Amino acid sequence: MITAIGDVMREAYKRNWITTRDGNCSVKRKGTDKLYITPSGVRKNVIYPETIVRIKIDNGQLVLNEGVEPSGELEMHWFLQKAHGGTRCVLHLHPTYSVAAMLAGWDLQELAKEFPEVHRYTKVAENVSTLPAISQALAMCTYGKMIKGGVQYDIVGQDRHGVCAIGRNPWEAFEHIERVEHICKIAMAANYKMPIKTNIKKMLDF
């Protein structure tokens, strides 16, 4: 599964869903005391198992050793990982059409409802509003949207930024992003005029 982290990051780069130093991925395995996460400031198209950062978990807290440089979005990953008892991957990418759709004012949750096949397999949360990258506000709002109303969503859009998805492994999280990116591409190619239901109050409410 650690090898798959590099595999999905390289595939995301090939699809132009990230530039060389964008995106991040983490894995926490059931019954273990380590969080595996991509490092900060490295080219994500050349991520391999030996470059993955390993962080010890002690009494529910991350123990960062001196010199370790995990992704700047570590807090967002940990919010989504720490309360989950099983094996989970968190994947954050910047897919072009998904970001473009949000920039155009679409709520990805509402758009997904227009495509039954996506809505069947992938639960899409309401968009997160525009917030600074690597901020606690982004981490908290992303987590809040992913569990809003007691529902565990699979993916959430982050306005003018990217998307964050979860899965039992990196490829499952990747597939959620792929489905949403596909419908965003279709909608934009068709110049689809979806009723704009997104507003700042809704995006901040969780």
Identify the meaning behind each predicted range:
Residues 1-206:
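Glycine-rich flexible loops
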